[in-house]
Amino acid sequence: MRLSTLSSLLLGSSSIVFARVPPTVDNQEPIKSTSYFLDDPDFPSHFEFENPETNCKYVSQPWIYNAFNSVSEDMEAVFKYAHPDLHVRIMGHHPFAGYYHNPKMAFVNSLWRLNNCLKDAKVDAKLWAIHGGCDQAWSVQEFYFNATTNKGQPWELTSLWVSRWDEDGLIREVRTWVDAGQIMRTLWDNEIWFNSSDRVHHYDFIPGPGGLPPIANKTELGGEL
């Protein structure tokens, strides 16, 4: 087994047994909204599982809760449960969007970069809900993030993760949705440079969404590709 939190394999069965936890979790701190425009989110004082079953083929909802709920203290926590060949697709049209072929690149280019824009690299992250999982390979996690930016501005973000798990409790595939406008505004306001500066050494072509010019295949430039 790859995860210390797995309890055991059922003998003679392909099901995975995860540590039993109550069907509700009551230790969540109330969310304190920093939004100028919204009242405090209608966030429950305790987390209720749609399916509290822990005798599961894949991962149970209580196990998913324990795995993802620590992201506020450790941004890397999510990727501790990533398969080495995990593929991540960040949906939308913004600097984080794209298809990542390994978890390390996805983490550095998104969560790590975003975390560096937040004061003291601290963020309050909570789960709104968990759907699916258990005997289904796919699960959906709804997150709410709350922090203060390096410039002292209140910051909020809601994110949706759609995850495919294997029978060892590792994530094999992720599609995630974020607020593109919030991401772009946060990077623009809090990064000293926006993807590049005169201190960056460029060794790869970065032509933008339009791709390389047609002349690239007719000159020595084409031989370098």
From Swiss-Prot:
Glycosylation sites: 146, 195, 217
EC number from the UniProt entry: 5.-.-.-
Pathway assignment: Secondary metabolite biosynthesis
Keywords: Glycoprotein, Isomerase, Signal
Record's keyword annotation contains Isomerase: yes
Enzymatic reactions: 2 [4-(deca-1,8-diyl)-2,5-dioxo-2,5-dihydro-3-furanyl]acetate + H(+) = 2-[(1R,8S,14R,15R)-11-hydroxy-14,15-bis[(6E)-oct-6-en-1-yl]-3,5,9-trioxo-4,10-dioxatetracyclo[9.4.0.0(2,6).0(8,12)]pentadeca-2(6),12-dien-8-yl]acetate + CO2
InterPro entries named in the record: NTF2-like_dom_sf (IPR032710)
GO molecular function, one term: isomerase activity
Organism domain of life: Eukaryota
Free-text biotechnology note from the record: Phomoidrides A and B (also known as CP-225,917 and CP-263,114) are potent inhibitors of Ras farnesyltransferase and squalene synthase. CP-225,917 and CP-263,114 inhibit Ras farnesyl transferase from rat brain with IC(50) values of 6 uM and 20 uoM, respectively. CP-225,917 inhibits squalene synthase with an IC(50) value of 43 uM and CP-263,114 with an IC(50) of 160 uM.
Gene3D superfamilies according to UniProt: 3.10.450.50
Span of the signal peptide: 1-19
Family (UniProt): Belongs to the dimerizing cyclase tstC family.
Role: Dimerizing cyclase; part of the gene cluster that mediates the biosynthesis of the antihypercholesterolemic agents phomoidrides which are dimeric anhydrides. Within the pathway, tstC produces the bicyclo[4.3.1]deca-1,6-diene core of phomoidrides via the dimerization of the monomeric anhydrides leading to prephomoidride. The pathway begins with the highly reducing polyketide synthase tstA that catalyzes the formation of a C12-fatty acyl-ACP, starting from one acetate and 5 malonate units. The hydrolase tstM is involved in the release of the C12-fatty acyl chain from phiA.
UniProt protein name: Dimerizing cyclase tstC
Source organism (scientific name): Talaromyces stipitatus (strain ATCC 10500 / CBS 375.48 / QM 6759 / NRRL 1006)
Gene (UniProt): tstC
